[in-house]
């Protein structure tokens, strides 16, 4: 689920970060502050408001129900919850990368007739790839470790919406510390190996 959440985060977050870095929008500061609220708000608060949106009585939930699509307390809700919790990390990191690019390079591409979409893919993204990669890894690790938002929106349903943090919590509650320790070690080991691999890849590409 963390992988799907990261794909969703990249799809929405990278273009959003570029727009925030390169475009002057009305209410841009308010939008930036709103997008960064997941970094400071308690996960249960985020989960509550998200549930109010996607639940059966929520605005999004009602629209989806008209198409016989259930979102709350399904695996899709777990993916959405993890994406919402990690979205701000990718946006902030990628935005910093885009802002560090020399404007003249993008302006040169524009004078050659490239569209904004073409400039984004052929100039901005290649030059900011390190920041995008760093943000992707951070958001993936955040999605992998999400607990509060997922519990509020998707529940703790074994075989459906239960994630590794939720499983660890359940094992601790059941006093099954051996399984809790095993999952915790797997989680820590995976994240450490991932960080080492990404660091090595970044050095090779330098």
Region roles according to the model:
Residues 152-192, 196:
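Interhelical loop and adjacent transmembrane-helix boundary motif
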Residues 55-56, 132-170:
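Non-cytoplasmic
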Residues 27, 88, 95-111, 177, ...:
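C-terminal transmembrane helix and the adjacent membrane-cytosol boundary/short C-terminal tail
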Residues 4-35, 50, 97-99, 104-105, ...:
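Transmembrane-helix boundary motif in ABC transporter permease subunits
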Residues 2-14, 18, 44, 48, ...:
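Hydrophobic positions within alpha-helical transmembrane segments of bacterial inner-membrane proteins
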Residues 47-83, 154-157:
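Membrane-interfacial helix termini and adjacent extracytoplasmic/periplasmic loops
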Residues 23-31, 59, 74, 104, ...:
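Membrane-helix interface segments
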Residues 7, 84, 91-94, 98, ...:
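Transmembrane alpha-helices
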């Amino acid at each position: 689920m963390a992988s799907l959440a990261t794909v969703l985060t990249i799809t929405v977050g990278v273009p959003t970060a570029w727009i925030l870095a390169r475009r002057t929008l009305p209410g841009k500061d308010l939008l930036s502050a709103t997008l960064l609220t997941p970094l400071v708000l308690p996960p249960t608060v985020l989960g509550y408001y998200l549930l109010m949106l996607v639940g059966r009585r929520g605005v999004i939930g009602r629209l989806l129900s008209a198409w016989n699509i259930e979102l709350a307390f399904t695996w899709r809700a777990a993916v959405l919850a993890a994406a919402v919790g990690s979205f701000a990390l990718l946006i902030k990191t990628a935005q910093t990368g885009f802002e560090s690019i020399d404007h003249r390079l993008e302006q040169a591409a524009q004078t050659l007739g490239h569209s904004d979409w073409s400039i984004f893919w052929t100039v901005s993204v290649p030059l900011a790839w390190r920041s995008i990669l760093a943000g992707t890894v951070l958001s993936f690790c955040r999605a992998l470790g999400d607990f509060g938002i997922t519990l509020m929106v998707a529940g703790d349903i074994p075989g459906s919406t239960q994630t590794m943090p939720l499983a660890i919590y359940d094992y601790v509650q059941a006093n099954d510390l051996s399984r809790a320790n095993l999952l915790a070690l797997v989680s820590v080991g995976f994240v450490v190996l991932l960080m080492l691999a990404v660091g090595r890849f970044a050095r090779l590409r330098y």
